[in-house]
Amino acid sequence: MDMTAAQVHELYKLRVDIFVHEQESPYKEIDDTDIHPGTQHLLAYETEGGVHLIGTARVFGKPDEGQHIGRVCVAKDARGHGIATQLVKKALEVCTERAAGIDPNKGALIELDAQSHLVDWYERFGFVVDGEEFEEAGRPHKHMSMRI
């Protein structure tokens, strides 16, 4: 699905509000991954009082080389309602659909870089930590992966 200019604006505004302002992270939020033809953006909308973006995630990478889930975020006033869970579940569905042609004996690799305080949350989906803690944009992260 191609995004409209308004959707792109909402996407960047939400991510900058969360990752740059709220988390005080000097992260370069606009990157080439967003425009890559293989990147799929997942968008969650609130419809009460008008339609506005409240959550997003992205899936990118090739199924035979490893897919990546990233930039999962939910607006501060929309947290606690399972939106991030729905976004990750949908991202896993997208990864599974993309991996349909992969040898089932090998499985398809899905990766993400979780902020360290969210490791337990991602483990609920089946991800496991597979590396040492590292810093990205001033925050501790751990690389996690799973095979489907």
PLM features per residue range, with description:
Residues 95-115:
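Conserved GNAT acetyl-CoA-binding A-motif
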Residues 3, 72, 87-88, 144-146:
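Methionine-biased hydrophobic packing positions in alpha-helices, especially
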Residues 26-28, 39-44, 56, 71, ...:
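Short hydrophobic/aromatic beta-strand element in the GNAT-like acyltransferase core
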Residues 43, 50-61, 65-73:
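Conserved beta-strand in the GNAT
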Residues 61-70, 79, 106, 137-141:
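A conserved beta-turn-beta hairpin within the catalytic core of GNAT-like acetyltransferases
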Residues 74, 80-96:
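Conserved acetyl-CoA-binding loop-helix of GNAT-fold acetyltransferases
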Residues 1-41, 45-52:
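Short amphipathic alpha-helix that is part of the acyltransferase structural core
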Residues 111-113, 123, 128-143:
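Conserved catalytic-core motifs of GNAT/GCN5-like acyltransferases
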